[in-house]
Every structure is written in C-alpha cells, then in structure tokens.
Design a protein with these regions (language model features):
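Non-catalytic accessory regions of SAM-dependent methyltransferases
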Residues: 1-126
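Conserved SAM-binding loop of SAM-dependent methyltransferases across substrates and taxa
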Residues: 245-258
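Conserved class I S-adenosyl-L-methionine
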Residues: 235-244
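S-adenosyl-L-methionine
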Residues: 268-311
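C-terminal catalytic and target-recognition region of SAM-dependent MTase-like enzymes
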Residues: 333, 347-409
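Conserved SAM-binding motif I beta-strand of class I
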Residues: 259-264
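Mobile active-site "lid"/loop adjacent to the S-adenosyl-L-methionine
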Residues: 307-337
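Non-catalytic substrate-recognition/targeting regions of SAM-dependent transferases
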Residues: 110-123, 142-218
Length: 409
C-alpha cells in the first residue's frame, strides 16, 4: 500500500505510461495531461497514469522538455539520506563486482540514468573525482551526494583527495543551471593544489587534467576496446586516427606494435599524446602528427608508408536525429579510405560514440564502404562501452558506443 508522502501528482499520457512501464525514466512536457499540487524546481513529484496507477517518483525540471526524471518506482520509498547512500553504495559495489581491482583506479562511478542518478556523472581518476551535473534534481542534492560518495570510497580504501566539478557544459542551460567549473568544497578539507593526476589503465600511464581535459578529463568508455587493440597489435604498423591524447596508440605500442603513427587535428591533443608516449617510454615507436584525418587518408594512398592496422575513433559526428545522414556520410568517407589503405590480412578498428548513429545504421555504412572499396571484411569482434558505463535496457540513450574489429580478407 502506498504511503502518503504529499508530493504533487503528474498524470501522463498512455504513450508515456507505456514507456515508463518498459523501463524508460523520462516524462516529456508534452506527455503531461494534468498536474495536482506544486513544488519547487528540482522537487519530487509522483507520476501516475490516466487511471490513477502509480508509475514512479522523480525530479521536476521546470525549464526542460524532459519535465520529470524518475528515480524510483517504489511507492513506499522514503528519499532521505539513507536512501541516497544505499544507491551510491549499490553503484560502487556494481563496479567492484564487474571490474578487476586494477581497473577501479580509473572508472565511471555513476552513469546517470543507468544508475538511477539522472543527469549525474562521476568519474574516478585515481584519487580525484570529476563530476558533471546535468539536471536540477541532482544539482539540489550534490551537498548530500558528493560527501557521501567520498566517504563510501574512502571507507573502501580509495584515497580520494578531492572532487572537481565539470559543469562547463551548455546542456545545463536547458535545466536553468549556470555553467562553471572548480573544486567542490568538501567540509573541513582543503582542495588539492593541482587538477592533474596520473592514472594507469591497461598498464598505460596517463596524465589526466580534470579541469581542462575533454568532458570529465579522459574517455573511460573505451578501456576494454583499447585492450582489444593492444592484443592484436604485435609487429604491426599502426595508424591511430583521431588519437586525442594517444590512448589507442599507446595500447598498440604496449602490445608490441612495430611502429605507431598517432594523428589528431588538435595541436594540444597531439602534444599531450606525445607527452604520454614519453611517459610510457614509447617515443621510439610512436610518432604524433597534427593533421586533419579527412585530408590525410587520401594523401596516404600515394605515400610509400603502408599500414596494416588502422584505428578510427572519431568524435561524435552527430548529436541529434536531424544530422544523422550527414554523420553517416562522414563515417563512410573515413572508413572507405581506411579500407582502401589496408592490405589483405590488415586490421581495422572502427567506432562511433553517437547514440543517434545506431548499430544498424553504422553496420549498413560499413557494408557500403567495404563494397565501394572492393574489400571483404571478416569481423573479429564487436564491442560496446566498458561495463562501468552500463546499458540499461529500456533506456536506449545509455547504449551509444559501437566498436568493431575487422580483418580485410
């Protein structure tokens, strides 16, 4: 029997009810039929069907098209400190259960909706936490959540020194939240002197700048895909395109590649990749080049240098359904060029981090590129984001990374 909690009730359309029943945690503004009661922005509301069936409780976002983000489907939950601490502990215990202890040095601790913390991303980089808050509900709770999470991690032997807020993202404006970044003031503690920390992933050392690095500082979702590349790289001449700070290239070098060329259009990224190569004593086998991959790949067809392993890890070419067609064109161009460069027996690692470029669309693009390049591909494996970025069934938005390893036959 549902306890009386006094939250406002939001009656939703049958379409929204169906989505919620199937596991989706969002209610859009256009799906709300009736509202009874009031609460502040970021406050809790109960969501019910037209027939009065309780569907869940979530945070109200008055300025967002995603008007309610569910956090519970239990009508008797009490949303006190103990509730949130249990959820944080559950999220950390999940990572411990699916990852080797060494992989916990750098991992995602909460992945938004996949962990029922809508709009909250927490990445752990050795002894620093990098946090991004994209919903008003989580913003209102951060003074409860962040100290509690630090306490949970410290009690488990993780020496957390500080928490850095990476709220310098435009998406916050849709929630009516200001942008900014800086150290979160843990009660009674002095923030660390530097936002730069060393992590070790797959045996590779990286310097991560949680203040100035992309997103939260480093892309953790390719952890095991990088390992898969390293496993096949022995003796190969490798071209790593869109290298960013050199992570795939370094895994290939550590895996015994004969030579690696790491390419990125960003001069600063190339400098960081070069520094990471030096840090791992890989400079003798790894060259870092600043170039536009779209221009470079056609040029390489005319060069004597040949590669037998090409890695394509581009940034998201689309962040909306409206631009998917253009994105697919871009993906096809670089994959076609890479396939043309590879000899028989060569390897191709290719991926997309865009949710809107679905696996079906991406695979169709790869078939078309292979046909046009006159090659046949043998799939070694297909992969997704690492398990600390779990895919929650019923929430398609959590399923975004596609990664394929092929051999040209």
């Amino acid at each position: 029997m549902k306890i009386e909690r006094g939250y406002p009730t939001y009656t939703v359309t049958p379409k929204a009810e169906n989505a919620i029943v199937k596991g989706h945690p969002w209610v859009y503004d256009a799906e709300i039929l009736n509202i009874e009661g009031e609460t502040a922005n970021g406050g809790l509301v109960d969501v019910i069907s037209k027939k009065g069936r309780y569907l869940g409780t979530g945070f109200l976002s008055q300025q967002s098209k995603i008007r309610v983000r569910l956090i519970s489907r239990n009508a008797n939950d009490r949303f006190d400190e103990a509730f949130w601490r249990r959820k944080l502990q559950w999220a950390w215990d999940y990572r411990k259960s699916v990852m080797d202890p060494a992989d916990l040095d750098a991992c995602r601790v909460t992945f938004g909706e996949a962990d029922a913390f809508p709009g909250l991303t927490v990445d752990k980089f050795h002894d620093l936490l990098s946090v991004q808050v994209l919903s008003v509900g989580m913003e209102n709770l951060q003074d409860l959540l962040l100290p509690a999470l630090v306490d949970i991690l410290r009690r488990d032997g993780q020496p957390i020194r500080g928490v850095f807020l990476r709220n310098d993202v435009a998406l916050r404006a849709k929630e009516g939240l200001p942008q900014g970044k800086g150290w979160y003031p843990l009660p009674g503690e002095t923030p660390p002197d530097s936002p730069v920390v060393e992590i070790v992933e797959n045996g590779v050392k990286y310097l991560v700048d949680v203040e100035n690095g992309q997103k939260t500082g480093f892309f953790l979702d390719q952890k095991y895909n990088r390992r898969a590349v390293g496993r096949l790289a022995a003796g190969k001449t490798v071209l790593d395109c869109f290298t960013h700070t050199g992570s795939f290239a370094l895994n290939a070098a550590l895996g015994g590649a004969a030579h690696v060329t790491a390419v990125d259009v960003s001069e600063s990224a190339v400098e960081m990749a070069r520094a990471n190569a030096e840090r791992n004593c890989m400079s003798d086998v790894m060259d870092c080049v600043a170039a536009n991959v779209f221009d470079l790949l056609p040029q390489l067809e005319k060069e004597p240098m040949k590669y037998d392993f090409i890695i394509l890890d581009p940034p998201a070419f689309t962040k909306s359904r409206k631009t998917v067609a253009n994105a697919i064109t871009g993906y096809k161009e670089i994959n076609y060029r890479a396939m043309k460069l590879l000899p028989r027996g060569g390897y191709l690692a290719t991926c997309s981090c865009s949710h809107f470029a679905t696996a079906e669309k991406f695979e169709a693009m790869l078939r078309s590129a292979a046909h046009d390049a006159g090659v046949q591909l043998r799939q070694i494996e297909s992969r997704q984001q690492s398990c600390d970025h779990p895919i929650l069934w019923g929430v398609d938005e959590t399923d975004y990374l596609k990664f394929y390893l092929f051999q040209v036959v």
